Regions:
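Extended, low-polarity transmembrane helix blocks
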Residues: 1-43, 57-69, 73, 79-142
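Short Gly/aromatic-enriched secondary-structure transition segments
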Residues: 44-52
């Protein structure tokens, strides 16, 4: 039992910012990789948005372009920890659209992404971030 308590104590001393950095990198990588795939396979992307995804309201080419642009830009903000809380919001929206209209059976994966984003929205990016440096420099909160 003593070993378990020692392990727990060691883990409790690890900075939460390490986990926050890993969360930003992991969820950002999922979206960035999807954006790169859309960019490098643009004709296939358009075909998927037209024939398979069928996102309502938006024309397929506009929806594809918007998805690609968000998937390539918002993860960079997450990687840098810049505007992190704001960057999570459009990603939540993308997850909601994907879950509702595109891949409703992939709810476990979407819930995992959403949980990570929710943590970042609630707790911020941590000390290993530009948000933290800016807050320190200009006297804002962490």
């Amino acid at each position: 039992m003593g070993l378990l308590f020692r392990v727990r104590d060691v883990l409790n001393r690890l900075p939460l910012s390490v986990a926050q950095l890993l969360m930003r990198i992991s969820v950002g990588s999922v979206f960035f990789t999807a954006g790169l795939l859309k960019y490098h396979s643009w004709d296939m992307t358009l075909m998927l948005f037209r024939d398979e995804y069928k996102v309502p309201v938006l024309p397929p080419d506009l929806a594809a372009r918007m998805a690609m642009m968000q998937e390539l830009s918002l993860p960079i903000l997450l990687f840098l920890g810049l505007g992190t809380r704001i960057a999570t919001l459009p990603l939540f929206g993308m997850i909601a659209v994907i879950q509702t209209f595109v891949y409703p059976d992939a709810w476990v994966e979407h819930l995992t992404w959403a949980s990570i984003l929710l943590f970042l929205l609630m707790r911020g990016p941590g000390t290993f971030s530009l948000d933290h440096l800016i807050a320190r420099r200009f006297g804002g909160q962490k």
